[in-house]
């Protein structure tokens, strides 16, 4: 299977939408009209997608469950209209250059962003930005990005989060969350370039390390 043009009229999926390695295309152009699904799964840690280079779903506004993307070749992830993910939102790619979710306001579960499908940082991504993101119900995790230097304003609108974890970020110089008042835990691990930690409104934390 190399294209999904036959699904061009698909607007909603009541249950799960899963893209397995049987699909050998480089993009998801055939799903451009999709507005809502229960969950979206493309690849997994045990079997990452190997051919997709661009994941763009311009009409998708809501995912009622989990949104999971895992691929060795994915360079671009673009959700121009996505406003909420009620479950977990996870992106892992060895080749990630950009991730765009400018309208995303809420993630009900964990938000996990990884610059690798394995244990070593590989993705060349240098910056990411979530300008409207206000709430993450679980853990916010950014891990294994060797070139990600700019995170100062990435989560500037975030008001509520369960916990924060930065791990193996070789060039990240700052950890800044200007609006967070309480957090379960903050863990900053293997971030040798980190110079600035700023949570000016933080009043209570379960742990800080």
Residue ranges of predicted features:
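Concave beta-strand-loop units of leucine-rich repeat
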Residues: 1-30, 36-56, 62-78, 83-98, ...
């Amino acid at each position: 299977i190399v294209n999904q043009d036959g699904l061009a009229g698909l607007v909603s999926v009541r249950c799960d939408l899963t893209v397995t390695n049987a699909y050998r295309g480089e993009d998801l152009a055939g799903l451009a009209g999709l507005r809502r699904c229960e969950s979206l799964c493309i690849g997994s840690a045990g079997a990452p997608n190997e051919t997709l280079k661009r994941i763009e779903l311009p009409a998708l506004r809501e995912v009622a469950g989990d949104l999971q993307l895992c691929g060795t070749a994915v360079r671009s992830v673009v959700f121009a209209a996505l406003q909420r993910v009620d479950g977990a939102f996870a992106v892992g790619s060895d080749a990630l250059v950009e991730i765009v979710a400018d309208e995303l306001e809420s993630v009900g579960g964990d938000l996990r962003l990884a610059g690798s499908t394995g244990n070593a940082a590989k993705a060349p991504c240098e910056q990411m930005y979530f300008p409207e993101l206000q709430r993450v119900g679980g853990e916010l995790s950014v891990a294994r990005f060797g070139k990600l230097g700019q995170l100062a304003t990435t989560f500037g609108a975030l008001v509520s989060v369960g916990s924060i974890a930065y791990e193996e970020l070789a060039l990240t110089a700052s950890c800044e969350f200007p609006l967070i008042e309480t957090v379960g835990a903050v863990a900053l691990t293997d971030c040798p370039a980190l110079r600035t930690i700023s949570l000016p409104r933080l009043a209570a934390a379960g742990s800080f390390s």
